[in-house]
């Protein structure tokens, strides 16, 4: 389980001070980037060394409760499944120990031509399902 902390800034909210719905996807994207870094990689190095580019193929999300300006949020990410060229994550956002957003995200590894390719062994070997 990987955790990423963030705060709701003015730029994340609508005119009512509530997080705009699409920004929850930004929050979980940032958490995924930090997850890769915590595993010892960077998106840039994966691209340069392996022609490896992770894209979202499918996302299923459930908005449970709104976050508001200056709320402290925790994004918890865990791997659910890994296959040859893809992996699935569960990413949930918490506010004060209460889940406010749930998602399952299917990521596919592609090359610059857009073709699915095998996840590098050096990365798949450190992914715990």
Where are these regions (language model features)?
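Terminal targeting signals and extreme-terminal segments of soluble enzymes
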Residues: 1-72, 80-129
């Amino acid at each position: 389980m990987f955790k990423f902390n963030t705060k709701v800034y003015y730029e994340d909210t609508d005119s009512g001070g509530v997080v705009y719905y699409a920004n929850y996807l930004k929050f979980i994207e940032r958490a995924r980037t930090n997850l890769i870094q915590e595993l010892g990689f960077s998106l840039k190095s994966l691209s340069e060394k392996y022609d490896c580019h992770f894209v979202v193929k499918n996302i299923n999300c459930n908005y449970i409760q709104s976050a508001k300006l200056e709320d402290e949020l925790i994004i918890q990410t865990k791997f659910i499944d890994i296959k040859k060229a893809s992996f699935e994550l569960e990413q949930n956002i918490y506010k004060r120990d209460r889940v406010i957003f749930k998602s399952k995200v299917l990521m596919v590894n592609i090359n610059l031509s857009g073709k699915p390719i095998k996840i590098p062994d050096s990365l798949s070997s450190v992914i715990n399902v």
